[in-house]
């Protein structure tokens, strides 16, 4: 049977979404320079890649964990210390999650209802970390998700449950190793999904990818307006439960606006492993994504950072090298976001657990930064530190 001539390309809905997406990037309120626009197109490229991949990976009966965001498909102020995976769910089906626990600082699970939209954060129906499941001496674990009543090893999928999000979080990049995790429907094991090789399915997937792309861009341009930009520049909020319902995580958020002659000193107590096995700080661009965290030190965990003799960590955010260990490079971004996260908490945090911020002239740093002499780092030491970041990241194999 001859193939009929194409009257409308199957990719037309996605092509239209792509044209609209380019306008969203160009009209973003923070775009004031060629560099802003160029970075926006890098962000757009990653979002295109992710939207196409996720549209083709959508499968609720034969689910697999797919990478939600990563170094080449950033979104939502992605944490440089975190591996993000998700699988799609039906709220009336039962799933088995099995795997082997790695040595990362935290492993958490979150069931979401729907998806992020430009007007709301999705409801978190269930959220827990691996302390809520049984892990054998060899690291193996198994639990179930389904519509039944909650019990040990079984978590209820509430009405509207749509996605299981998994976060695996590093504190020591060099020493910790990721685990193994798998999801499946036991009633579908050994079967195969129906073939999806018709043009109608392809057209639907292109349309879905286009909708995903636009929603992704609109949402995460609006997200900072809800939680960041309503605060004064060069301040950070007290610790608070992280929006979106992630269990046992608090965060402190802010945005900076600095000249090349200025520095922001962020001083925060080191919570300690007994309170927060994971504590980390990062910078982000106005596109609400992480900066280059592989080749530049734009993030630090408590394990990576220098802790002063008084039990506090002092981070210096600046464009020019201040010559200290806890320099956070803003890599040409005079405006951006800064966030501290505490995870796997054993107690709620109080304002005294949060950061204090001071804006200074960079040449005042030797007088203004406590323990300045001990904090200094040579150029050779700095290059070794960056090389260690590059090597540790490469071993994650996230290309």
Model-derived features with residue positions:
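A compositional/structural signature for long, glycine/proline-rich flexible linkers
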Residues: 1-399
